[in-house]
């Protein structure tokens, strides 16, 4: 197939549906199973980044339409076909039966109680517990008194074990958590039970935004939890304040940031710097259907508005095993140009991006069929930085390794929070307060976090260009 630009004209196939879905409130009419499966195969055949590794996606796999439809008829559902067309190592491509739910997730909207947490197995034991990472303001969890650092080991009275089905246990519209605490490194039950309800919430990507200063230095601290295209103005405003206040250093906290919109990651990297306009940020490598494309550092957002840039030559980035995709691309994209001091633990290792593929003639959202609301979110590209760095399957290794101590998480933004303190000490920032007292350390293996069952979990997505 002749290569074409992905974002020019994708008139590669016209599916059999002709009705349009310009209005989200339009009634969805039942689709024929074969037509649904055809949409899945066509979308994956055109876009899937690993198409060459899937024999059933080869352009010459079927001699005619009858052969293709006979193959499609073997699969009882679009989900079954989609799974069949993925490579064994693909953890991130998904299919959804209602693209409106996916769109909400990508914009930070979901039914939630506002408690962000991780589930951990203590090293060399069968003890499992949850720990609260942070709480969304004005959420049910915040109103119930849940705070960062709280430990819980039961949900609805069910004690956690390595075999617990956490997805099922935590999926209800409401549940209760039973608090526990560490005493000399031992996990001890308390009598405190907190009931939590879920409502529709929109998470603000900027969780903490502050300036830490003394007589000689100003350090900006930004805890950023997701790259959301609908919150670009808030991010630019935060950097506008950093510029106005004249900060000398920046600590960017991405430890709980699983990724999101790639263009927002480029903009954030451009705000941190500013002196590399037009320089290569990354190359987008597609399958053989499309030419590779480049992404450059910029001085404007997608609306054409100027970015507030710091022109820094060094940035500190805090990471954890939950740091993924667009977060990793900020690190990777900046590495060839500035001193990136990474503090924490290895990141996830996600360097591929996806788009939402709708059932329309050009696979865009406009004019999507009324026959169903399915959409695909397949991996369509790999990203390579200006130095050729990619394929970091084991994550990006920190310069200063420091695992979160679950018995002493600290307060986000406080100078004695362990990861932030490590950054300030490396900067040479004079700290008035002494280091906090030592706690019996508690470390463990992260089993899952609260976002793991969400549609936007650790995904990096791009848009069709206009």
Feature map (PLM): residue ranges:
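Flexible, low-complexity junctional segments that flank or bridge functional domains
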Residues: 21-249, 441-466
